[in-house]
């Protein structure tokens, strides 16, 4: 029985569409092996074989964040398992996303990157991908805001765009409940650094709560073990500290 594989490049985006990450779906994790050797090893896993042989359509959301290396390996993996030299082994592939948004995080152990985006790969060209550009905007109705966002998306910085952004910079907000505005940072490390600094400035007594959460999971030869420090078992809090 054939089916449609619904995937995305991150856990959060996969959850929103009721799918799984493309890395989990394909069995491709973080590896320092030679690409072809690694693919050959993954292609022998029974559940991966069954998954790709019955796959009719593969959907990959947030395609801009998929590395060229992973894109090429998925392409080749499908060919090997299905014994079909057509692009992706004859599987219909639907890619969605915006290459003007977040790009891929390239593997640090690969010192030289010939390509940054998957559309630069020979496999992309060989797949003869048809581009469909959606133009209707559903999330915004403010015409000026939409025009500003579209210019920023294309890297255009003119006087109109600058004026709109500057008008919102450091704008005073009503602070009725004494809550500080949320700050966004590119890394968890930087966010933790700022959170700890604010936490230390609060003079109230600290209270620590410890939690032990047990989760049952089905593991299959993971090449990307969960980082030991991904989550802490202790939560520290003080009166007046924001959570």
Cite the ranges covered by each PLM segment:
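Conserved ATP-binding/catalytic motifs of P-loop helicase motor domains
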Residues: 1-243
């Amino acid at each position: 029985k054939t089916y449609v594989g619904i995937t995305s490049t991150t856990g959060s985006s996969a959850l929103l569409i009721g799918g799984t990450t493309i890395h989990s779906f394909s069995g491709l994790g973080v590896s320092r092996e030679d690409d072809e050797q690694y693919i050959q090893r993954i292609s022998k896993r029974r559940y991966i074989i069954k998954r790709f042989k019955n796959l009719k359509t593969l959907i990959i959301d947030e395609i801009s964040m998929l590395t060229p290396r992973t894109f090429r390996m998925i392409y080749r993996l499908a060919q090997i398992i299905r014994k079909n030299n057509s692009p992706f082994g004859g599987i219909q592939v639907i890619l969605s996303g915006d290459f003007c948004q977040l790009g891929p995080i390239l593997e640090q152990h690969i010192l030289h990157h010939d390509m940054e985006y998957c559309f630069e790969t020979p496999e992309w060209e060989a797949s003869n991908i048809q581009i469909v550009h959606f133009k209707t905007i559903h999330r915004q109705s403010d015409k000026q805001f939409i025009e500003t966002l579209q210019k920023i998306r294309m890297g255009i910085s003119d006087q109109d765009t600058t004026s709109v952004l500057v008008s919102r910079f450091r704008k005073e907000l009503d602070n009725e409940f004494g809550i500080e505005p949320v700050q966004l940072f590119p890394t968890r490390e930087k966010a933790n650094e700022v959170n700890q600094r604010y936490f230390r400035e609060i003079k109230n007594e600290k209270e620590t709560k410890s939690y032990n959460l047990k989760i049952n999971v089905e593991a299959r030869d993971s090449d990307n073990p969960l980082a030991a420090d991904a989550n802490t078992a202790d939560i520290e809090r003080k009166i007046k500290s924001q959570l």
